[in-house]
Amino acid sequence: FSKADLTINGSGTLTVNANYKHGIVSKDDLVITDGNINVTSASTAMEGKDSVKISGGTFNISAGTNGIKSTNTEASDKGFISVTGGSFTLVANNDAFEAETVLSIQGGSFDITTGGGSANASMKSDGTPNRNWQNNMGNGGGGPNGMGRPDDNGNGTGGEPPAMPTADNTDTTDSTSTSAKALKAGSEVNINGGEFKIDSADDSVHSNGNIVITGGNISAASGDDGMHASGNLTISDGTVDITKSYEGIEGSIVTIDGGTISVVASDDGINCAGGSDTGSTDRMGADQFSSQDGVELNINGGTVTIDAEGDGLDSNGNFTMTGGTVCVCGPTNGGNGALDYNGTATVTGGTLIACGAVGMEEGFGDNSTQYSVLHDLGSTVSANEKLTITDSDGKEILSFTPTKTWQSVVFTSADLKEGETYTITAGSQSETVTIDGIVTSNSKGMSFGRGHGGRRGF
């Protein structure tokens, strides 16, 4: 424990067994550059109130509550965690990394388990409480929305450290919380590099503000959301593989400019919805049909693969696609769609093929500039049957092998041309469609967005 800064920069081994409460605590900045750090704690393993800065070292952490946290709520340039390197094996009953303001990770390797893992989620995949959930620590929460932050590298700027406490008090406060997130921040999570293996009972990556992914390789199994931002969520590079989730990727404005993204979700694959999470077991929005201002899904690049039991791509506002490649294996029930939007859906570039059930299917709107097709086949196609779309010369334009049954498909490609006839082949079925306008459809499904995706409790 230190009332001032605490720096660990040796190459030796430090082992801390904190059977009563916290492991390593600094009331100011906690800085670690090297060493083998082993911490077993009844409460928080490592805390720097003003900041935590880690550039190297090997960490083996088992925490009764939180793993690594920074808690200063009084200054916008404090309360951050910056990690540029290191190897972390971290098991926490609550959050693994929790920053009151910004969590910035530029490199390192991370093997993280929280709350007993995704199998011990507080909610079942259908949104009902999981009776196996054992944590009993009240209501979760990170830092407040809109809190200021340090620069993008997570380095605090300006300001003097707070005055030393007048009392000789070595205690720090652990907020009581059922929160069992892997990477959590109050204003922003910024990931520019690193290798991540996450198994979390709660959200794998969570911000009360924004999430920015510009690099790294993330593999996550989540008992709730794979990634959740109450503000904007942007992915421009890196690999994101969400192998298990309730909703895969969620934010008010989700923008994908690049990277390789794969999502498996028991509800929506990508969900864009406004407002704050409520914690209710009712995972639906209050108004399922109205379009929400400031809510958008934008896909401008990258490769996106979705396997969702709910809506594949769901925006309670607009959906715009200008580039990238998207494949959606959507719902098998008619109450959800491979695409779902409440505003407009516009495509000007890129390639998309999305399969799902008949009933609530939607395609792109006629405000698009690239041709698209929404087509319902005569009967259901079995799982693992290859779908191909060929032109009149037999040239394959698109292909996809959905792993679930489906009957409706929406597709778009720069190769589609008006007046051309294309053949849709799946299993024993083969049907033709002639492009007769910017949107060609034989569907009798939904013609407007529904907004089945809602915000939920953090």
Predicted regions and their residues:
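A composition-driven surface/loop motif
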Residues: 1-458
